[in-house]
């Protein structure tokens, strides 16, 4: 039996299977902060990636393109911390957002999450904690101790409260790995250096201590051996006993001399220390005692990272092969292991108690029994209470304590036991009962309540029953905790807490008999019963049938409570609740009509029987409700006429629910019944629904009853809103007939809907006493003329006066016109005008009179109004017209009168006198009218004076338009007359601007010359001089130079710039020269005229530095570098030194540049100037001056100049410069170009730069200095990034031997890396294939196998390719290669070893084909190896197809135990072919999975009898008995025939065989067959057959046996019958006892049958002479 293990070991996944490159599985690239995530940094092609593996979904790794030096996942969430250089960032992957970032001043060499929100950062000097919460920066915790200097930091740990911090590092010393730790106390701020390799903190609570102790565990492998230390850090908490220090040896096997601890985790659940070593060993130690529990090797590779495994309270880690492994305590096995294997029962007991582990039951029972036997009951009680899994907390233990009598004055052992259990936790069900029974008997109920509150008792139904007799409320609490629903609900009902019943029942999913409960509650309290009933139906699905609940209410005649219940229960108004709604309304209509009225009024229900309820409402006197429910018109008309019993407002609304026809019928019925009583309601209904009922129908209905009063009130209610003209007309008619004249006036005044003509004619015909309505209609609709005629002809002149005085005085002009038309006297008209003073339009009155040529009629009235001080324009207009027509000094009136309208009067004068029109228009500033009059009458002088005085730019713009045909004469008058007369500058300014705006430059010049040059008051005006020159620039450039020379008071710089912009460069030059602006003048010569010779002459004449500078700049731009430099020197201007240097560089004027830069250096000690001066000296080959300059004080960038000299191949100068700045790298490059190779190598050694080594190396290769090249190359190849370029350089030049020599020499370097081994292997494959195999066998683990694979394949090195595929675990490719190139690559042992590891099973069949073709004699060996994974059916089909089955017979025999049909049939065919009948019979008996019938049919025709015998055997096996027997008879196999007939159990077949024996005269066979088929043969048939054939002697033994059996049966039957009779007699005398259990007989009594001889196949043949079973009845 295998030994039990105390640990459970599990491999969770293989990182390489997830596509992780093995090279990236290491301490520097893989991190695991917890068992949730693994984070790996990879480089795929040129892209850096971070792979995050979620351990809950490892098959879907997350890949992110992130370039970082390190990445660590948060222990719990998808938050990642990234480090790139000194920059730290924290990202939330799910939110895709950056949480925090910080840049450190020092490099972070190690970092780790120490909690869910804190990262520890370790630099070379200190340790920091960085919280990801808020905006906090990293906080320094402590400085690193000197003992950790030079160590590789491998871990950082803290205790639970982060009060103790531990930094761990390792270093190589004296050929061993030494561990160094720094333990730091946050509170004391002190550090202690400790030698150790792995450590962890733990919280441990010792027995008897109140608080947990903080333990520090660390392991060390020193020169003397390994030790595990467990100590308590800090001062023990108050009241705690200090934890005793532990120091135990850590065993390391002899073969692991260099092994040391690398990781430690402590299981908080089991208090076990997990220690892992470098060589993959795991050690388990008990935390409390330090005892070693278990040690074994779990990994052949180093486990370099670990974390706690929360799911199992164990440890999880990753080794270098990429296996993710976990180890945890096997709870079922650890205690038995400690007990049986370690033989440490004390530790087993201690761990079992401490961690509640099973496996120590026997130890605890033994200890308990021993203490109990000694009378040490208190200790026994402790053992029983502390035993894990409650193994001793049994009723038997309680009975044992109960059996012990209590000592006087002492607590009984039972109570001691219960006391210990209560201190530790909760009692179980039996313990709770046994404790509470005596407590309740003593009346100490408060103890029970206390224990229940503290959850010390396990509640049960039995405990509740026990408590209920004392306190039902307390019992309720027990029942609730015990979850006994029926008892809980019973207690709720008994204690009156019915509101909790439903809630509790729903909560626990219990369904009691709700109706029974309701009856009980209703009997006790109807109010509580109502409340309970409402709770039953408050959900969507009622708990009980509402009808049954209502029946319960009605049983107790609780109408009010039932109503309240139903109102609440039926509030959702469901269709299915219709009968209940009817029942609710019915009971209230019969017993409380007011309640029913309120319910109906709230419109809560809609699904009750409306017809039935309507009848009940009418009987109850609720006519309104009855009408709401009536649907028949007869019923409605019967009720609706009683309007005095109905609410009028409701009745009006009710009509809205009736159809139009029904409404009209009801209205007719109301008027017919009592028109006086019902008229008001009728009118209200008609008013509200006139749109639906049609106003015309209602009007006709009123008129049919001759009710004009009703019609008036009805139409009065709608006329204000109606747009129907007929309604308004009918309303006017009704108002007239009812004498409502004021209403007629109002509607005539306010309505806009009636037909005015129709109403006017009606009012004329009506002959009303008051004509005001008619006046209003005529006034509103402009029938004034008709009105005047009607009133004048009917002698109603007083209404004319009333009209113009009171109704509408503004209509006076129309009335006057009408009166003039009827030849009314002038006196009457004048009097009427005087009566209506100022309340009408004078213009209209003048127009009416003027139309009739009676204007003079108004002269006295007009003069009187002016005399009164009237300022109305119309009055003055009329008077002006009269004065103009009468020629009564009109011009004076027009100039002096300020009140008339200039446009009106001017228009009146245009044809009569244009001059007067101009006067009128000018007075009113009527510009357009004035212009038109002047243009039409050629009054241009007047117009020009008016325009100048007007000073309106817009007006000027309108007359100066090119489209104006009168523009030229107007301009002539402006220049000659208007401007000459003016002295106002503003008038001149506006006029000039107008000409400018109109774009009339020539006219403007003419105008300005008149003003400026003709010695006017405006001659020296600066703006006008500027304008004159600018206009000339624009219009006539020939005059510009003249104006420049004649005028002096203009803005020279602005004018000059404008001249330049208009390409008048000479004029601009003249202006600048005239005003001595020389810099601008020379600029014009340079930039615009472009004549540098004139500029040079001008500069010599001026001799100003600024002018020389401008000239120099221009010369420089034109490429005249030498002249430019001379000009800059004359200007003494070094400001443009950069442009000068650039130009000199381009043109090569180095000598001149030296002069310029020497001048510039005197003016400014610029670094650029001195740098360029050095380069210029180098270019002019003044090396002595250069060396003197650079050795003296200077600010030049010598390195930069050296690089330029180097680039331009001035290597001598570059040598001086690089030497000066000690740039050995560039010096070495320079020396290479000078051919000084040895000196170049020395310089490269001083520079120690990869780039320099590479450059010198390449130069040495080109110079064939291979020894020096190799010296350089050895410094390059250790850098993996540079290796490829170096190899390509050698290869491109064909120096393969030298390259291989260099790489072979480099393999021994300390910094030799994978790329070197890989590239050397590739070179071997190309140039020295004979050395390839040896190299791979030595260094296969250090080469990049995929890369070498490609090289080996390209070089056709098939054996080496197979070797690499095998090492790279690409077994499929290895097999394919061996099969494709068997001559070079195939080796039998290697092939069979690899083929079993392939992933693609298809290769098995290709391998079989390969062996069949190349190695047929070894095929069976291969098949034996492949058989575990081979599909045998497919293999057999293949061999059958190629007809090679005999070749693989050994394979077929070896796999036949699988009972495969194809294998069986193939082997059987081989046996038949080989005529091996014995092997065939053995195969058939052992393996039955083949086509039996097909094989039998094939064999029955075989020429060998043994094979035909097997055919009969097969027919027998398939129940083809007759065919089998016939075949035996044919081949004279008599024994087989008798045996098969016997086995068939077929009587007919056996008798046929007997007959055949007799026919063939085989009497001996007949006798043998009688006994062989004894059970099948019928004695009568045998007797008859023997008698007929006279062979009674052969049959006699058979008959003797038959007689013997039958006599035995009869004797047994007789004995059985006698026994039965005796039992019957005994039964008759026995009294009937009802208490005895009754038997259920499954069948009646039957005749006993003696036992028969056994038959095969579970079937018993009936005895001869007994009835055979029929189809359900006995025959």
Curated annotation (Swiss-Prot):
Residues 639-1675 are annotated as: Proximal segment. Residues 524-634 are annotated as: Distal segment. Residues 196-257 are annotated as: WD40-like repeat 5. The N-terminal seven-bladed beta-propeller is formed by WD40-like repeats, and projects inward from the polyhedral outer clathrin coat. It constitutes a major protein-protein interaction node. Residues 68-107 are annotated as: WD40-like repeat 2. Residues 302-330 are annotated as: WD40-like repeat 7. PANTHER family: CLATHRIN HEAVY CHAIN 1 (PTHR10292:SF7), CLATHRIN HEAVY CHAIN RELATED (PTHR10292). The modification Phosphoserine is found at residues 67, 1167, 1229, 1494. Residues 108-149 are annotated as: WD40-like repeat 3. CHCR repeats lie at residues 537-683, 686-828, 833-972, 979-1124, 1128-1269, 1274-1420, 1423-1566. It comes from the Eukaryota. The gene is Cltc. It comes from Rattus norvegicus. Its main location: membrane. The keyword Transferase does not apply. The modification N6-succinyllysine is found at residues 737, 1441. It is a peripheral membrane protein. Residues 258-301 are annotated as: WD40-like repeat 6. It is found in: Cytoplasmic vesicle membrane; Membrane, Coated pit; Melanosome; Cytoplasm, Cytoskeleton, Spindle. This is Clathrin heavy chain 1. The modification N6-acetyllysine is found at residues 856, 1441, 1501. The modification Phosphotyrosine is found at residues 184, 634, 899, 1206, 1477, 1487. Belongs to the clathrin heavy chain family.
């Amino acid at each position: 039996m295998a030994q039990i293990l105390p640990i459970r070991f599990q491999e969770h996944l293989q990182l390489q299977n997830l596509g992780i490159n093995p090279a990236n599985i290491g301490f520097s690239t893989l991190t695991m902060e917890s068992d949730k995530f693994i984070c790996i940094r990879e480089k795929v092609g040129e892209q850096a990636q971070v792979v995050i593996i979620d351990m809950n979904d490892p098959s879907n790794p997350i890949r992110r393109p992130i370039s970082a030096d390190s990445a660590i996942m948060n222990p719990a969430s998808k938050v990642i911390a990234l480090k790139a250089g000194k920059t730290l960032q924290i990202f939330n992957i799910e939110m895709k957002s950056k949480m925090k970032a910080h840049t450190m001043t020092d490099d972070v060499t190690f970092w780790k999450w120490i909690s869910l929100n804190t990262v520890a950062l370790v630099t070379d000097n200190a340790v920091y904690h960085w919280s990801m919460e808020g905006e906090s920066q990293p906080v320094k915790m402590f400085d690193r101790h000197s003992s950790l200097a030079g160590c590789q930091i491998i871990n950082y740990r803290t205790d639970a409260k982060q009060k103790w911090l531990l930094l761990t590092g390792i270093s190589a010393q004296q050929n061993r790995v030494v561990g160094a730790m720094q333990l730091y106390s946050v509170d004391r701020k002190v550090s202690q250096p400790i030698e150790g390799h792995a450590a962890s903190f733990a919280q441990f609570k010792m027995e008897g201590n109140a608080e947990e102790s903080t333990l520090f565990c660390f392991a060390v492998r020193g020169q003397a051996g390994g030790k595990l230390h467990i100590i308590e850090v800090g001062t023990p908490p108050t009241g705690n006993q200090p934890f005793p220090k532990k120091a135990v040896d850590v065993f390391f096997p002899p073969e692991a001399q260099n092994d040391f601890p690398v990781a430690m985790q402590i299981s908080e659940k089991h208090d076990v220390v997990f220690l892992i070593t470098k060589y993959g060993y795991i050690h388990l130690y008990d935390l409390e005692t330090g005892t070693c529990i278990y040690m074994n090797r779990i990994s052949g590779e180093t486990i370099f990272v670990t974390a706690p495994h929360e799911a199992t309270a164990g440890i999880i880690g990753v080794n270098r092969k990429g296996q993710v492994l976990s180890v945890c305590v096997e709870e079922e096995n650890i205690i038995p292991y400690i007990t049986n294997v370690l033989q440490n029962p004390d530790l087993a007991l201690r761990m079992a108690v401490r961690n509640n582990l099973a496996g120590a039951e026997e130890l605890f029972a033994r200890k308990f029994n021993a203490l109990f036997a000694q009378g040490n009951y208190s200790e026994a009680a402790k053992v029983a209470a502390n035993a894990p899994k409650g193994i001793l907390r049994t009723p038997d233990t309680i009975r044992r304590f109960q059996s012990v009598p209590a000592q006087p004055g002492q607590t009984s052992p039972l109570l001691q036991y219960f006391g210990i259990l209560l201190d530790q936790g909760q009692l179980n069900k039996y313990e709770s009962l046994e404790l509470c029974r005596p407590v309740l008997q003593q009346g100490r109920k408060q103890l029970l309540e206390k224990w229940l509150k503290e959850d010390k008792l396990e509640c049960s139904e039995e405990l509740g029953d026990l408590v209920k007799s004392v306190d039902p409320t307390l019992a309720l609490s027990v029942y609730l905790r015990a979850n006994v629903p029926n008892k809980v609900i019973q207690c709720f009902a008994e204690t009156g807490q019915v509101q909790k019943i439903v809630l509790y029942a729903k909560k626990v999913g219990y369904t009691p008999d709700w109706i029974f409960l309701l009856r009980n509650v209703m009997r006790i309290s109807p109010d509580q019963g109502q409340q309970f009933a409402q709770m039953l139906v408050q959900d969507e699905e009622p708990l009980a049938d509402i009808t049954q609940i209502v029946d319960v209410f009605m049983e107790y005649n609780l109408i009010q409570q039932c109503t309240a219940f139903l109102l609440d229960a039926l509030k959702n108004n469901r269709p299915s609740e219709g009968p209940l709604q009817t029942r609710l309304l019915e009971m209230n209509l019969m017993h409380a009509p007011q309640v029913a009225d309120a319910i109906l009024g709230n419109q809560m229900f809609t699904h009750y029987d409306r017809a039935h309820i309507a009848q009940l409402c009418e009987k109850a006197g609720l006519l309104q409700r009855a009408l709401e429910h009536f649907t028949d018109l007869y019923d409605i008309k019967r009720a609706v006429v009683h309007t005095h019993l109905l609410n009028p407002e409701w009745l009006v609304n009710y009509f809205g629910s009736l159809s139009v026809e029904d409404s009209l019928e009801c209205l007719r019925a109301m008027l017919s019944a009592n028109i006086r009583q019902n008229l008001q309601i009728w009118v209200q209904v008609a008013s509200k629904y006139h749109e639906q009922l049609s106003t015309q129908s209602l009007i006709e209905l009123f008129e049919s009853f001759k009710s004009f009063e009703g019609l008036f009130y009805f139409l009065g209610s709608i006329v204000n809103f109606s747009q129907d003209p007929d309604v308004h007309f009918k309303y006017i008619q009704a108002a007239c007939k009812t004498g409502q004249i004021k209403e007629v006036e109002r509607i005539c005044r306010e309505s806009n809907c009636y037909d005015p003509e129709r109403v006017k004619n009606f009012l004329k015909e009506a002959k009303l006493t008051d004509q005001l309505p008619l006046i209003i209609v005529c006034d509103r609709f402009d029938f004034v003329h008709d009105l005047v005629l009607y009133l004048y002809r009917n002698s109603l002149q007083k209404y004319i006066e009333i009209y113009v005085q009171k109704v509408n005085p503004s209509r006076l002009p129309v009335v006057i016109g009408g009166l003039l038309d009827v030849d009314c006297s002038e006196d009457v008209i004048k009097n009427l005008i005087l009566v209506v003073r100022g309340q009408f339009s004078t213009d209209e009155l003048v127009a009416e009179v003027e139309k009739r040529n009676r204007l003079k009629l108004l002269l006295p009235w007009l003069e009187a109004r002016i005399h009164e001080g009237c300022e109305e324009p119309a009055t003055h207009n009329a008077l002006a017209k009269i004065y103009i027509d009468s020629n009564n000094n009109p011009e004076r009136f027009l100039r002096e009168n300020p009140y008339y309208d200039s446009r009106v009067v001017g228009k009146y004068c245009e044809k009569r006198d244009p001059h007067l029109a101009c006067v009128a228009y000018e007075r009113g500033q009527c510009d357009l009218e004035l212009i038109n009059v002047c243009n039409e009458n050629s009054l241009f002088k007047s117009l020009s004076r008016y325009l100048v005085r007007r000073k309106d730019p817009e007006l000027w713009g309108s007359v100066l338009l090119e489209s104006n045909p009168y523009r030229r004469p107007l301009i002539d008058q402006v220049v000659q007359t208007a401007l000459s007369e003016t002295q106002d500058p503003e008038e001149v300014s506006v006029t000039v601007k107008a000409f400018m705006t109109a774009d009339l430059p020539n006219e403007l010049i003419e105008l300005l010359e008149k003003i400026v040059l003709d010695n006017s008051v405006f001659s020296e005006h600066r703006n006008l001089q500027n304008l004159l020159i600018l206009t000339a620039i624009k219009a006539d450039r020939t005059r510009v130079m003249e104006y420049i020379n004649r005028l002096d008071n203009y803005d020279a710089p602005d004018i000059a710039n404008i001249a330049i912009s208009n390409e008048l460069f000479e004029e601009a030059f003249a202006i600048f020269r005239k005003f001595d602006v020389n810099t601008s003048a020379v600029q014009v010569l340079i930039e615009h005229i472009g004549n540098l010779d004139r500029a040079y002459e001008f500069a010599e004449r001026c001799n100003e530095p600024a002018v020389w500078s401008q000239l120099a700049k221009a010369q420089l731009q034109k490429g005249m570098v030498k002249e430019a430099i001379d000009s800059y020197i004359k200007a003494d201007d070094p400001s443009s030194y950069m442009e000068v240097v650039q130009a000199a560089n381009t043109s090569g004027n180095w000598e001149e540049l030296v002069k310029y830069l020497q001048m510039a250096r005197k003016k400014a000690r610029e670094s650029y100037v001195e740098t360029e001066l050095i380069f210029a000296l180098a270019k002019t080959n003044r090396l002595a001056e250069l060396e003197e300059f650079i050795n003296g004080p200077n600010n030049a960038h010598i390195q930069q100049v050296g690089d330029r000299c180097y680039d331009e191949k001035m290597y001598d100068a570059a040598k001086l410069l690089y030497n000066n700045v000690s740039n050995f790298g560039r010096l070495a490059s320079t020396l290479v170009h000078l051919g000084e190779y040895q000196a170049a190598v020395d310089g490269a050694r001083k520079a120690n730069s990869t780039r320099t080594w590479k450059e010198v190396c390449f130069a040495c290769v080109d110079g064939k200095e291979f020894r020096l090249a190799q010296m350089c190359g050895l410094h390059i190849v250790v850098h993996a990034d540079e290796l490829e370029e170096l190899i390509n350089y050698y290869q491109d030049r064909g120096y393969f031997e030298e390259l291989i020599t260099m790489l072979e020499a480099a393999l021994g370097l300390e910094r030799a890396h994978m790329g070197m081994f890989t590239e050397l292997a590739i070179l071997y494959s190309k140039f020295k294939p004979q050395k390839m195999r040896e190299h791979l066998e030595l260094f296969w683990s250090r080469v990049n196998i995929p890369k070498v694979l490609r090289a080996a394949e390209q070089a056709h090195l098939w054996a080496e390719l197979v070797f690499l595929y095998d090492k790279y675990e690409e077994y499929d490719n290895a097999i394919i290669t061996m099969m494709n190139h068997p001559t070079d690559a195939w080796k039998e042992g290697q092939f069979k070893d690899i083929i079993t590891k392939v992933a693609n099973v298809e290769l098995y069949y290709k391998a079989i084909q390969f062996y069949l073709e190349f190695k047929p004699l070894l095929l069976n060996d291969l098949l034996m190896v492949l058989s575990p994974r081979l599909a045998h059916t497919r293999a057999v089909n293949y061999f059958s197809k190629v007809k090679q089955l005999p070749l693989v017979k050994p394979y077929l025999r070896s796999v036949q135990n699988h009972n495969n049909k194809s294998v069986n049939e193939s082997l059987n065919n081989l046996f038949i072919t080989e005529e091996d009948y014995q092997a065939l019979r053995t195969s058939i008996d052992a393996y039955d999975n083949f086509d039996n019938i097909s094989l039998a049919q094939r064999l029955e025709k075989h020429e060998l009898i043994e094979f035909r015998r097997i055919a009969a055997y097969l027919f027998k096996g398939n129940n083809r008995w007759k065919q089998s027997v016939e075949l035996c008879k044919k081949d004279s196999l008599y024994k087989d025939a008798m045996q098969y007939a016997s086995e068939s159990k077929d009587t007919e077949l056996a008798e046929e065989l007997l007959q055949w024996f007799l026919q063939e005269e085989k009497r001996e066979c007949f006798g043998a067959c009688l006994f062989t088929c004894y059970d099948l043969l019928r004695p009568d048939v045998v007797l008859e057959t023997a008698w007929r054939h006279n062979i009674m002697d052969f049959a006699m033994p058979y008959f003797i046996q038959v007689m013997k059996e039958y006599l035995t049966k009869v004797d047994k039957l007789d004995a059985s019958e006698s026994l039965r009779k005796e039992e019957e007699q005994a039964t008759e005398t026995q009294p009937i006892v009802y208490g005895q259990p009754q038997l259920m007989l499954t069948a009646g009594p039957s005749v006993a049958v003696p036992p028969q001889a056994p038959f095969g196949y579970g079937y018993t043949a009936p005895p001869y002479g007994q009835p055979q079973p029929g189809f359900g009845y006995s025959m």
